[in-house]
Amino acid sequence: MTDPCVYILGTAAVTPLAATVRENCNALLEGRTCFARPRHFDSRGRLLGVDHGLDGTGCSRMERLLRKLADSLDFAVPAGTRLFAATTVGAIDLLEQGNEADTVQEFLHMAERIFDIPDGILVSAACASGQTAAALVMRELRHGRCRHALVIGADITSEFVTAGFGALGALSHTVARPYDQDRDGLTLGEGAAALLLSCDGPGCGRLTAAAENCDAAHITSPDLSGGQLAAVCREVLGGTHPGAVIGHGTGTVYNDQAEIAALQTVFPDGMPPLFSLKGNLGHTLGATGLLQLALGLEFARRRLLPPQAGLVSPMPGANVSNTPRSLETGRLLSLNVGFGGLNSAVALEAS
């Protein structure tokens, strides 16, 4: 028996570049980036994908980001819609201000209040949180546990997270250069995205499959063979060939090495065009997966893939380009990975 279709009824994306999906895609196709020094903490000279419009006092930076996302919705949310909220660290700025609250639970409470949907479901699965939430929603819809679901993902830039990735030696000395031979680390960013999903169509697109696993190779490093990431890719593709891959592409040495190894395993006769948002936006943590799906759907609709920002010398085997490329189909594969060995793949298709 074929699983019911999961239709995408609406999308939203808020980044430092723009506050709509359309405007973000235009900016990405132009190769624009948003890297700057933050004003809300001392980054010790490091650049971040920072939204200065979120600066201020009186409430959490996360609350301002969620309100900006809610204000950007250009679709109606049906009565009875369930809320699924994804984040890596939540309202981490509350902790930095001396508040001992549970930062991810506070994030959920903010989301419930701002979107006016009670009894939300929190998903926090490191940097795979966004797509993990989307996969959970797909299962809930297909089992008839809800009719409509609003899945959101958001994370902010913070001193806490910057210091943590710095301690791991994972931050770039300049800016992230995904899939480049001379990449030297990631750049952190902030943003939010939302998808309204339902088994009731039609919509502007659909999520056709999702799969997740854990390779348990290391707490913070991926399995360099890419074997388990390749496994989830094969599971969601089911023999089909996507027009492009929206990769996790952090710009760290190990992540990109493992990802290219996985894609070469899955596509031995030629890798589809590959692109990572992180060269433009930085690593937005729990928002990353949903930004990839929301913006990826628009790429698929336009049949255009943006140029890879930061690219100078492509890694061997990586099908990346510093110019926009046309897509042969409106089918895309989106990848997320997270600390602890998490691997996630989602396939989507434009209507």
Where are these regions (language model features)?
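Conserved catalytic cysteine-centered active-site region
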Residues: 1-2, 35-64, 90-140, 145, ...
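Extreme N-terminal starter segment of soluble prokaryotic enzymes
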Residues: 2-9, 330-331, 343, 350-351
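Condensing-enzyme catalytic core mediating Claisen C-C bond formation in acyl metabolism
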Residues: 3-15, 19-48, 175-244
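Cysteine-centered functional microenvironments
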Residues: 5, 12, 118-135, 177-189, ...
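Conserved active-site "lid/cap" helical segment
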Residues: 17-92, 231-241, 266, 270
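Glycine-/small-residue-rich "gating" segment that lines the acyl/pantetheine channel
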Residues: 135, 157-203, 319-327, 348-349
